[in-house]
Structure formats: structure tokens, C-alpha cells
Amino acid sequence: MWRLVPLKLGRLSRALKLAALGSLLVLMLLHSPSLLASWQRNELADRRFLQLNKCPACFGTSWCRRFLNGQVGFETWGRLRLLDFLNVKNVYFAQYGEPREGGRRRVVLKRLGSQRELAQLDQSICKRATGRPRCDLLQAMPRTEFARLNGDVRLLTPEAVEGWSDLVHCPSQRLLDRLVRRYAETKDSGSFLLRNLKDSERMQLLLTLAFNPEPLVLQSFPSDEGWPFAKYLGACGRMVAVNYVGEELWSYFNAPWEKRVDLAWQLMEIAEQLTNNDFEFALYLLDVSFDNFAVGPRDGKVIIVDAENVLVADKRLIRQNKPENWDVWYESKFDDCDKEACLSFSKEILCARVTVDHNYYAVCQNLLSRHATWRGTSGGLLHDPPSEIAKDGRLEALLDECTNPKKRYGRFQAAKELRGYLAQLSHNVR
């Protein structure tokens, strides 16, 4: 009798799967004309699909020529609009190629928000401009705060945008000048003066800063200069293009030990670079999970591919203003929650201290240690070490101290030693 129960449950499970598959096939047949049309047509050359008609309530136009000329095309399954309901994050994979280059390369396309978030953005703009939830965005944008810097305003100042997003939670003038000078959605980039931007470009800059500042992070801290972010390529309407890096870090969760050690070392090096660098900008990662990093297939390099939640603190400004306890080392508190990718932090403290261990804590807790949980797994990237390393105990001790320190300022020392130990292990196994 007991053996029949799992058998029946198994049959029920298979029946449900077949029913779901059958429903999907029926939907595909019902939509077959539009399905065939979407398969054959390059929708990335369609102005309305790109939502170019919503500019200047958009992210830019620097890549419009490439899109509209058909140089960017969805990869196979990306052509099926019927599957868009599964693509909650509105992230697509596509192929891009210049005719004169003769080849094509993979790129990632992002709308920078879900359909719901984008609809809420439109409603917010309309309500602020007209008091109604629907309107002509082209007419409404000049009547919102995104147009406050139009005209003869010389600089983008902290007072104008402070708190709009994580990137500018506590902006310095030096950071904002960098954002404007490196803004890629204008032909006249290179100047920190706002008056060198068109009114439409200023509104696009401010809207991006408020809605999802990831493009501005990638532009201001570019991969070409050694920053560990994906390369920004351009935008058209509400579609942003970035370079495809490789498979997400999660796909390496069960990779050979040697590979995982190398990736862990790189992650700790990223934490160090973003915390301490010659530019004296501290870039704190507020959302750290396996999905937010990717690994290059050729060079094996770890890159951050989701930079929406990055807080930038200007250490020079902190030293200059000397807020209360500015020179006291800040230790992040361990958060033993039952959810995935938990982090505990205070944005106000991150903005007011020169020495902060947040990035070490985030990487150790959410990616490397036994406390890291993701998609139903636990143990972190460094799970199941070889017997000799497990027996030695040093790795586990460093990871525990980096995650939940028992000594005062223990995480700072543990992170330093962990970087050295991982470097030693990775060199030994190469």
C-alpha cells in the first residue's frame, strides 16, 4: 500500500506537467499569427518596442542608430513575445554586429525595471505634471523635477539629487561632476558643466539617476579603467545595452574546488578594490547574490553585472567635513536571517565613516561562507573543501570571523588574511 503513494504522486506530477505543457501549446497555437510575426520580425528595430516614443522619459539615444538599422537582434527564444511573462526582470540576450567588423558578439539588453515598475514611473511623471495617471510624457517631462536643471544651471549639485537613489544617497560634488563628465548619452561628453548638455539629455540623466542608476555606475566607473563592472554600450529609448560577460556566478557553485577558490579570491579582491582605491571613492554593494556576478569564459574574470544598488561615499569629503565618529572603524553587524542574500547595514553610517568593512562582510556572508544560502542551497561557494584543508581548519575559521567576527575589528583582519590565504591556495592549485 505504501509503495503506491509515491507512484500515484509521481503520476500526478507528470500529469500536471503535461497539462501545463499542453496549455502552453494551446496558447502558442492561439497566438500563432502573432507568434510567427514576432519570430520573423526584428522587434529591436521597432521604435515603439524600444519605447523611443517616451523620450525624454527614457534612458538615452546613443545606440538608436544601431538598433533601428537592425544591427541588434534577439537570440532565438528572445524573439518570442509569448514568453515575456517569464522574463520578470526584463533582461534579454541579443547579438550585435557592425557590418564592417564582419562578426557578431553577444550583448545583454535591460529595461532597468519590471513592466510594473516602468508603468509606475509613467504614472508618477504624469501625476506630478498633470495630476492624472495618464498623459503625454513628452509634454509632461518639462513640468517635473527632472527638468529643474534645464536652462542655464551650471552644475549638478548634491542639494538637487541627494537621496534619489543609492548611488546618490550622500553625493559629493566630486562624484556628481564625475557622473556628468562621463555621461555617455551625449555627443559632448567630457565636461562636468550641465550647460553643455541639451535639455532632453539632462532630463534623461536625472530620470536614470532616480529610477535605476546602474548605467551611470557603469559609465562613471568603467571596466576599461579596471573597475569590476560590465561594460556599458549605449541606450535607445528604454532599452540599455551592456557587454555580455559570461555565465552567472551561480553556475560555478559546484565547479571543481580549484576554480571555486580562484573565484572566491577574486570576489575578495573586488571587495577590497571597491573599499580602498586611489580615487578615494568607496563603492558599497548593498545587494550581493550569486546572480549579480558573472564569470568570463576565456579569462575567468569575475565581473559585477547588476550595479543598481551601489552606494558611493566620498572619503575625501568625509575627512574634510569630519562628521561625528568619522574616524572610528565601522563594523557591520552579522544578520542571521532565514532569507536569501540578507545584509544588515546603515546607509547613514556608510556615508559618514572612512573605514568600513561592509564589502568584506557582504561577500563573506552571502557568497563564500557556510551562512550563504541561494536557491535552496547552503554552504557558500567554498563548500566541501578537500579533506586536508577542512582538517586544517584555517579556512573555516577565517570565513567565520569574516562573516560573524568574535573579536573587535576582527573582520578587517580576517578579510586581509583570507585574501592572502585564498591567493596562496589558488596559486598552489594552478
Swiss-Prot record:
Question: Major place of localization?
Answer: Golgi
Q: InterPro entries recorded for this chain?
A: DIPK2A/B, FAM69_kinase_dom
Which tissue types show expression of this protein?
Answer: Expressed in heart, brain, liver, spleen, kidney, lung, thymus, testis, ovary and muscle.
Keyword terms, alphabetized = Cytoplasmic vesicle, Golgi apparatus, Secreted, Signal
Q: Name one GO biological process term.
A: negative regulation of smooth muscle cell apoptotic process
Cellular component GO terms, alphabetical = COPI vesicle coat; COPI-coated vesicle; extracellular region; extracellular space; Golgi membrane
Q: What residue intervals traverse the membrane?
A: none
Q: Fetch the Pfam families from UniProt.
A: PIP49_C (PF12260)
| Main function | May play a role in cardiomyocyte proliferation through paracrine signaling and activation of the PI3-kinase signaling cascade.
What name has this protein been given in UniProt?
Divergent protein kinase domain 2A
Gene for this chain:
Dipk2a
